[in-house]
């Protein structure tokens, strides 16, 4: 018999991580998680402790869903994060978890729900569509071999690269300002608080190592790139992979080779740390046409994911 119950904080963290890790066995771009990784996530400003549910089949935990409400966002739009262990997919568990999440979001005053789906997971996509979700966005996970990093491909040589200094509050404040200014026209944008930027730079559980660099032109910081190494992912997948977690240039300085310069510096940083592969994710409809830049420096699309949305 299938039952769905609420997550109990302080009790269910090991269960949550066990199911989440098992559900990612067939995913190439996600690794397993551990309790020590979940706890830092809960320290993220705006983290939603409510809305988490676990599906149990004959007493065995087989799926989970988080009807995630961003407490810092005023758009009344919730995000459904759903995971089911592969051998239990397609048995009706996803539908019951989705319906539970939709009811939870509605009760909590949300007016719309979003959900993500791997483009290869046709069964889940069809379920979303049957429940009234509409496709609203596409994204790409891209990879490149760091042996193929090139130079002289249009990078701006007049731009200086300066590392962020973790003990300088001014640097953290500048990343916060740049991030909000650069991404303000993007899908699902809301301004990050300074506390969120600190979390992103220094506390994110995904990266044991992270480095961030400013692009400086005529004494002004006009963009940045942030790269990181997820050691657990690399060990589990038996790869030496680093990630470009964020890169951006202020609007008035785009199309001048500055993004290319930042990308190449980030890739060389990962390569110098012994990485052999770089990974990033991009919104296919990014208004800055970032996908074109990434292809220019050598990235190729490995997989697609879709964002779906419906009114409540």
Residue ranges and their predicted role:
Residues 140-166, 276-279, 283-291, 297-312:
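C-terminal "cap" of GNAT-fold acetyltransferases
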Residues 20-57, 61-68, 189-217, 222-226, ...:
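Active-site rim helix/loop that mediates acceptor-substrate recognition in acyltransferases
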Residues 60, 71-73, 85-159, 306-310:
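Acyl-donor-binding surface of acyltransferase catalytic domains
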Residues 77, 105-118, 270-282:
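Conserved GNAT acetyl-CoA-binding A-motif
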Residues 90-103, 246-249, 255-268, 272, ...:
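Conserved acetyl-CoA-binding loop-helix of GNAT-fold acetyltransferases
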Residues 69-80, 89, 209, 231-244, ...:
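A conserved beta-turn-beta hairpin within the catalytic core of GNAT-like acetyltransferases
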Residues 1-39, 154-192:
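Short amphipathic alpha-helix that is part of the acyltransferase structural core
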Residues 54, 80-90, 247-254, 284:
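A short, internal acetyl-CoA/4′-phosphopantetheine-binding micro-motif in the GNAT/acyltransferase core
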């Amino acid at each position: 018999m299938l039952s769905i119950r609420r997550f109990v904080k302080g009790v269910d963290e090991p269960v949550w991580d066990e199911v989440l890790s098992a559900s990612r066995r067939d995913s190439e771009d996600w690794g397993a998680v551990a309790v020590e990784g979940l706890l830092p996530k809960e320290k993220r400003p705006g983290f939603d402790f409510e809305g988490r549910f676990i599906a149990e089949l004959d007493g065995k935990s087989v799926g989970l869903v988080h009807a995630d409400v961003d407490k810092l966002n005023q758009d009344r739009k919730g995000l459904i994060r759903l995971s089911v262990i592969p051998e239990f997919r397609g048995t009706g568990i996803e539908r019951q978890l989705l319906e539970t999440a939709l009811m939870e979001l509605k009760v909590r005053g949300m007016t719309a729900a979003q959900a993500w789906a791997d483009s290869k997971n046709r069964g889940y996509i069809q379920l979303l569509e049957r429940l009234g979700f509409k496709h609203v966005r596409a994204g790409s996970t891209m990879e490149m071999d760091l042996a193929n990093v090139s130079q002289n491909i249009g990078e701006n040589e007049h731009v200086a690269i300066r590392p962020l200094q973790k003990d300088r509050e001014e640097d953290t404040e500048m990343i916060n300002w740049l991030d909000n200014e650069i991404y303000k026209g993007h899908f699902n944008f809301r301004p990050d608080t300074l506390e969120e930027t600190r979390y992103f730079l220094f506390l994110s559980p995904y990266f044991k190592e992270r480095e961030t660099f400013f692009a400086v032109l005529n004494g002004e910081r006009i963009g940045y790139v942030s790269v990181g190494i997820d050691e657990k992912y690399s060990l589990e997948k038996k790869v030496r992979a680093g990630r470009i977690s964020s890169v951006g240039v202020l609007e008035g300085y785009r199309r001048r080779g500055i993004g290319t310069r930042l990308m190449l510096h980030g890739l060389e940083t990962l390569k110098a740390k012994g990485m052999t592969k770089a990974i990033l994710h991009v919104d296919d409809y990014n208004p800055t046409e970032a996908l074109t830049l990434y292809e220019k420096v050598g990235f190729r699309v490995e997989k697609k994911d879709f964002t779906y949305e419906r009114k409540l």
